[in-house]
């Protein structure tokens, strides 16, 4: 699958959007956790409930004619690593409870989707000399239709590398403990970015799979190993 892709500085991206939101006129921010959707009755002729706001973990109620859910991986999220698991939306952040239950109580059906993430790499432990640099476009296209264009700052390259038979053999030894294969996880994974376990199982005839080392930002040594998302035990992926 071919598509445009932007590699962003994770910290600066977050800081820029916070700055934008905090400087948007008539927009007020409240840091809390939504735990319940509040409903009221529509006009009698329709007879169906209508959302009227939310209640937060701190007990504050916000009234609204419309509630937009941008929940990501947090609604009743569970994180797996081998046979171990813990509630959470991502490492270090709690799962969110209450919103799903509110929807189910109103007759909505809830299901589960799954996604994975690779272990991050320390740039100080990477031998970049054996990797193939992947540079960004000199004149990149935009994702938006906005005519407002800013000059591209000095870009950092990504790097291309491939798995090997040795890597495949190590990972296959952990298939018995992998939630993907022992029945713990039954959700369907993302179609265009399968986990490394899915790739080894589905494309068992392939001797290698390409991986991209992507810098997470200018202020960190962390590299994201794109193409190596996994739910195997940490000692196997490292």
Regions found by a protein language model. Name each.
Residues 48-53:
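Short, hydrophobic/aromatic-rich segments at coil-to-beta transitions
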Residues 69-70, 214:
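Short beta-strand segments
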Residues 132-217:
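Long, low-complexity segments enriched in small/aliphatic residues
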Residues 234-238:
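Conserved small/polar residues in nucleotide/adenosyl-binding loops
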């Amino acid at each position: 699958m071919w598509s445009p892709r932007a590699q962003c500085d994770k910290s600066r991206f977050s800081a820029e959007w916070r700055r934008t939101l905090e400087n948007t006129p008539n927009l007020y921010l409240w840091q809390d956790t939504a735990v319940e959707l509040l409903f009221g009755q529509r006009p009698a002729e329709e007879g169906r409930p209508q959302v009227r706001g939310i209640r937060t973990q701190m007990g504050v109620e916000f009234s609204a004619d419309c509630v937009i859910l941008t929940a990501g991986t947090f609604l009743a999220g569970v994180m797996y690593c081998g046979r171990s698991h813990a509630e959470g939306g991502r490492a270090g952040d709690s799962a969110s409870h209450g919103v799903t239950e509110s929807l189910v109580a109103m007759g909505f059906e809830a299901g589960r989707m799954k996604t994975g993430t690779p272990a991050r790499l320390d740039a100080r432990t990477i031998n970049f000399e054996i990797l193939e640099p992947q540079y960004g476009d000199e004149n990149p296209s935009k994702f938006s239709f906005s005519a407002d264009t800013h000059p591209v700052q000095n870009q950092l390259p990504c790097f291309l590398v491939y798995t090997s038979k040795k890597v495949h053999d190590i990972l296959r030894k952990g298939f018995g403990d992998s939630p993907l294969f022992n029945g713990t996880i039954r959700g369907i994974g993302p179609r265009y970015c399968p986990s490394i376990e899915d790739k080894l199982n589905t494309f068992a005839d392939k001797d290698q799979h390409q991986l991209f080392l992507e810098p997470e930002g200018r202020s960190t040594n962390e590299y994201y190993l794109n193409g190596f998302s996994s739910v195997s035990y940490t000692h196997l992926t490292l």
